[in-house]
């Protein structure tokens, strides 16, 4: 496999996770991304001093491999629980789903470690 090279299209979560696993297996990998930054739907954009999440506002963890990645990110301070409240008229109640997570300081914090 020494002369085999891999091209991964897209530096979002799926593309970077794929490239990361290939690199861990000592494969030669090149990631191609058309945007200026990493993240895809988990991208954090900047305009001057303002940073904002450009795509997904939160993630959920449903698969075991992704849950392990989220647990590592949580311990490293790159992920935090998000407990939104639903508002209607003058009433508010907790959202029905408990495993909503947000990247810290932005969603792209979840993909940056995979790009190393």
What do these predicted regions represent?
Residues 40, 68, 112:
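Alpha-helical elements of the RecA-like P-loop NTPase motor core of helicases
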Residues 58-65, 79, 87, 91-113:
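Short beta-strand to alpha-helix junction loop
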Residues 15-16:
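N-terminal Rossmann-fold NAD(P) dinucleotide-binding loop
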Residues 2-4:
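Core beta-strand elements of the Rossmann-like FAD/NAD(P) dinucleotide-binding domain
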Residues 44-86:
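N-terminal FAD cofactor-binding segment of flavoenzymes
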Residues 116:
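A conserved beta-strand/loop element that lines the FAD pocket in flavoprotein oxidoreductases
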Residues 7-11, 20-48:
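Glycine-rich FAD pyrophosphate-binding loop
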């Amino acid at each position: 496999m020494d002369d085999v090279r891999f091209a991964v299209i897209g530096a979002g979560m799926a593309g970077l996770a794929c490239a990361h696993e290939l690199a861990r297996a000592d494969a030669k990998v090149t990631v191609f991304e058309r945007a200026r930054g990493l993240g895809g739907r988990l991208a954090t954009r900047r305009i001057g001093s303002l940073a904002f999440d450009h795509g997904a506002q939160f993630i959920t963890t449903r698969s075991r491999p992704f849950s392990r990645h989220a647990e590592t990110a949580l311990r490293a301070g790159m992920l935090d629980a998000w407990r939104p409240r639903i508002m209607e008229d003058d009433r508010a109640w907790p959202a029905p789903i408990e495993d909503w997570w947000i990247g810290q300081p932005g969603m792209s914090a979840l993909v940056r470690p995979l790009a190393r």
